[in-house]
Amino acid sequence: LVGAKVKVKNETTGFFAEYTTDDKGYIKFVSDRKRDYSLSSHYHSHKDGTGSFNTKIDKDITKVDLTFEMEMIKKGDVFVINDIYFDYNKATLRIESTQELDKLAAFLLENLNIKVELSAHTDSRGSSKDNLNLSQKRAQSCVDYLIQKGVPKANIVAKGYGEGKLVNKCSDGVECTEEEHQANRRTEIKVLKVN
């Protein structure tokens, strides 16, 4: 893709640089020998791509061909947003949650043609009614934050599902590990419309 943003990170030193693909979809950069590199690509209205390579051979490398498969984002796509945290039984965003929401805000501001539902889910512990109310408040808290960052209100809707869409067997009365319950406590983005 022409004009895609590619971030190249030297995993040994932590140094990274950002490039834009040329008219043939390529980037050029100078790498160090005997290093591991990770790459991530970003292009509006597409899912991000990732890859890696290393230069741990003794010969000079003049060219490395890596291909990223970057699918168009389409209606119905669902993405889990990691690292969104709330205190127990609260709907106030914790400060460490803002980094992921800032990334989402940047994406939505870059893609004003996309309308999304931000949904919050709980585990099955507690009453269904309380979980539904709590999840709606948490979803709204995230949406309010995104609107404060400039995301148009018309492009995002909050929806709490409570314990209504569990991703595993951990319903009422089923013994589960904390990790299994955690899998159900999640925040997701669903694409409602792409113009």
Task: List each language-model region with its residue ranges.
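Periplasmic OmpA-like peptidoglycan-binding domain that tethers envelope proteins to the cell wall
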Residues: 119-195
